[in-house]
A protein has these predicted regions:
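Structural recognition of the beta-strand scaffold that forms the well-ordered cores
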Residues: 1, 50-55, 85-90, 133-136, ...
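Conserved SGNH/GDSL esterase-like catalytic core that processes O-acyl groups on lipids
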Residues: 1-70
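Serine-dependent acyl-ester chemistry module
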Residues: 59, 94-115
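Catalytic His-Asp segment of secreted/periplasmic serine-dependent ester chemistry enzymes
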Residues: 105-207
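Low-complexity, Gly/Ser/Thr/Pro- and Asn/Asp-enriched, turn/coil-prone segments
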Residues: 226-320, 382-431
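Short, surface-exposed beta-strand/strand-loop-strand elements in extracellular ectodomains
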Residues: 328, 349-368
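A short beta-strand element within beta-rich, extracytoplasmic domains
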Residues: 335-350
């Protein structure tokens, strides 16, 4: 039963008034089905439920004083579903860089928020004996953050990353409810790397064993890297909604990140090269929904729809001047080598001249600035497009003395818009 950001008070009010305020999301024959305008009473009566999970809204999860109606809600559910076991879902702390409006309630400190959530969840379990099990997803996520994935379990600073983030929470539910050790379980979505599957499963397992404290995943501090040399190109897809399958790496958040993501090459091998969003991006672009399903092939690379439809934005107001830069850091490059960078920027359903993005690379030296007019108006324009015009290519780029190259993205004020963006990035060794 879904309402975005819904707290216990609203759930209880909806229960009392039998308000048709929910989207009822259900998995039917392997497919998620959503029904709008549902009542709690309808959802509770729809199945002979074995388990019913409750939780507080994320920003209030660490504030037990906001749980005042929990006893009433439990009693109401037990009256309608007396045989169901009730679960309490311990939510996770926000990313350290989160801009969520509730984060300052915890001094914008991840560990303060985590500790508060653990304390409140345990108090709920102690004070409400009808709660049968605690699902320690918050601890599982915090465990995962001790691995080489770092503080990269949220796509926007508070919602879970949609592949391994959600999978970690799912593994926690599985082991807690079934009692079966999830480590080694053969099921995982194909979009998750096998090394990351191990992190998610171990993070969940240790959370079930120790739900109120963080377990340091000492065996997962860095990925297994077969060769420190970059043998094959690297493809990076930026954007929140359409994840690209192997061989693409996905960066879903525009938020400043304190964690470097380890990157795989097109042969599906981890490299020692890392990427992170430094600062300056203001939003993400999810696409418009009417994009052609066709890939874009340019510069010898096939960019699937999932790579070119969405991206990261640096956005301002028209007639107020250029905006940016948004900055992305590529790190741990070989200082003795040179690299080629190809940036793709497409804004579907936009006039070609309305949005102009400019790009500069800063390594051992600063590159020349390159501009891309990013708009493609419609499917006919897409079919006729010369996609060479939608890339910015930088060759023989040398990293700085620390092995870093910074990608800078600006939006030029055209009078129609001031918006820069990046959809995808390809990196290869210069020949």
């Amino acid at each position: 039963m879904y309402i975005g950001g819904c707290d216990l008070d609203k759930h209880w009010a909806n229960f009392q008034s039998d308000a048709a305020a929910y989207e009822y999301r259900k998995i039917v024959k392997g497919e998620k089905v959503g029904k709008i305008g549902y009542k709690l009473s309808q959802g509770l009566a729809d199945e002979n439920w074995d388990y019913i999970s409750l939780q507080q809204a994320s920003g209030k999860s660490g504030k037990y004083e906001t749980y005042t109606v929990l006893a009433d809600l439990i009693a109401g559910i037990k009256e309608r579903c007396p045989k169901a076991k009730l679960l309490w879902h311990q939510t996770w702390a926000y990313a350290s860089s989160s801009t969520h409006e509730s984060f300052p309630d915890y001094d914008s400190n991840q560990m303060t928020m985590y500790s508060s959530i653990v304390t409140a969840a345990r108090q709920a379990m102690t004070n409400h004996t009808d709660l049968s099990l605690l699902i320690p997803s918050g601890t599982a996520i915090q465990n995962g953050r001790t691995s080489f994935l770092g503080d990269a379990f949220n796509r926007d600073g508070y919602h879970l990353e949609v592949t391994y983030g959600r999978y970690t929470a799912a593994c926690t539910c599985f082991e807690m409810i079934t009692g079966q050790n999830v480590v080694g379980n053969p099921y995982a979505p194909e979009t998750i790397d096998p090394q990351v599957v191990k992190i998610a499963q171990n993070a969940a397992h240790y959370a079930v064993q120790k739900p109120d404290e963080v377990t340091d995943l000492v065996d997962f501090k860095q990925p297994e890297i077969s060769d420190t040399d970059l043998k094959a190109p690297i493809y990076i897809d930026f954007g929140p909604t359409s994840l690209s399958a192997t061989p693409w790496n996905n960066i879903t958040s525009h938020q400043e990140s304190s964690t470097t993501s380890w990157i795989k090459d097109v042969e599906n091998n981890y490299t020692n090269i890392g990427v992170r969003v430094l600062d300056g991006f203001t939003a993400t672009h999810a696409g418009v929904g009417s994009e052609p399903a066709s890939p874009v092939t340019v510069d010898g690379v096939e960019f699937p729809l999932t790579a070119w439809k969405d991206g990261l934005l640096v956005k301002g107001e028209k007639n107020q001047g250029d905006v940016g830069p948004g900055r992305i850091e590529i790190s741990q490059l070989d200082v003795a080598r040179k690299y080629n960078f190809t940036i793709l920027a497409i804004r579907f359903n936009g006039s070609k001249d309305a949005r102009i993005s400019s790009y500069k690379l800063v390594g051992k030296t600063e590159s020349a600035v390159k501009e891309v007019k990013t708009g493609i108006k419609d499917a006919a324009s897409f079919a006729a497009a010369n996609f060479e015009e939608y890339i910015a290519k930088f060759e023989n780029v040398e990293p700085d003395s620390e092995g870093k190259v910074i990608v800078e993205v600006k939006g030029l004020d055209t009078g129609s818009a001031a918006e820069g963006h990046i959809n995808a990035l390809c990196i290869s060794l210069a020949k």
